[in-house]
C-alpha cells in the first residue's frame, strides 16, 4: 500500500507571508541603500521625542544586512510556526498572529527607548518581535490542551536561556566584541529590545488567545 510521506517541516501561510514581507522590505532597502533607509525609518528614542511614531512599526521590517535578516527569519520560522497554528490559519487567526507580532515588536522598541531615553542609536530588525514569538512558543510546550503555566519547566527554561544569551550579548557589547555576534555585522545588539519583546509575548499570548476565544 502506498503511503504519503509527511514533509519534515511545513510553515503555515501567515508565517510565509510575514517572511515574504520582511525579505521584500530588505530587498527594497538594499536597492535604495541599507543605511539611508535605516536612518530614515529605523527606530530611536529621538524619533519618539520628535513625535514620529511610524518607526515603531517600520523598523520591524528593516535590517542591517543579509545575515541579520536571515538570522531573524530563521527565528520567526522556528517559533512563529507553532504560534501561527495556535492562532488558527483562517483570516481571524492570521490577523491575530500578525497583530501579536506587531504588538511585541512595538513594545520591544519602547522597552529599548525606556533603557536609552536620550539615545540616538537607530534600532532596526525583527528580533524583538521574534523574541515575543519565542516566548509564546514556550507556552505551547505542553501535552495538555491549554497553555503551559508560567512556572512550568519549559517556560522557565526558555526564559532563563534567552536571558542568559542576552546577558552575554550585553557583556560582548561592553567589551567591544559585537563583531562576534551572528548577524550583527559588528553593530551593537539591542538586547534590551529582545528582553522587552520576550516579556510582552510571554504575558500577552494567553490573554489574546482568550480574547479571540482560541485559548
Per-segment meaning from a language model:
Residues 1-215:
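A detector for small-residue-rich transmembrane helices and their helix-helix packing motifs
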Amino acid at each position: 500500500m502506498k503511503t504519503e510521506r509527511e514533509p519534515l517541516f511545513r510553515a503555515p501561510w501567515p508565517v510565509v507571508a510575514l517572511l515574504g514581507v520582511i525579505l521584500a522590505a530588505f530587498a527594497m532597502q538594499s536597492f535604495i541603500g541599507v543605511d539611508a533607509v535605516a536612518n530614515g525609518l529605523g527606530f530611536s528614542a529621538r524619533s519618539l521625542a520628535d513625535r514620529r511614531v511610524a518607526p515603531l512599526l517600520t523598523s520591524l521590517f528593516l535590517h542591517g544586512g543579509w545575515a541579520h535578516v536571515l538570522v531573524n527569519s530563521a527565528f520567526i520560522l522556528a517559533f512563529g510556526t507553532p504560534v501561527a497554528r495556535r492562532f488558527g490559519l483562517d483570516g481571524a487567526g492570521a490577523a491575530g498572529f500578525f497583530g501579536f507580532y506587531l504588538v511585541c515588536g512595538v513594545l520591544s522598541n519602547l522597552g529599548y527607548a525606556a533603557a536609552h531615553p536620550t539615545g540616538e542609536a537607530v534600532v532596526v530588525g525583527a528580533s524583538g518581535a521574534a523574541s515575543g514569538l519565542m516566548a509564546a512558543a514556550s507556552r505551547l510546550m505542553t501535552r495538555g490542551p491549554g497553555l503551559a503555566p508560567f512556572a512550568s519547566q519549559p517556560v522557565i527554561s526558555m526564559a532563563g536561556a534567552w536571558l542568559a544569551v542576552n546577558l552575554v550579548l550585553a557583556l560582548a557589547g561592553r567589551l567591544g566584541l559585537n563583531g562576534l555576534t551572528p548577524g550583527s555585522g559588528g553593530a551593537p545588539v539591542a538586547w534590551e529590545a529582545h528582553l522587552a519583546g520576550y516579556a510582552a509575548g510571554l504575558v500577552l499570548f494567553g490573554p489574546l488567545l482568550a480574547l479571540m476565544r482560541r485559548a
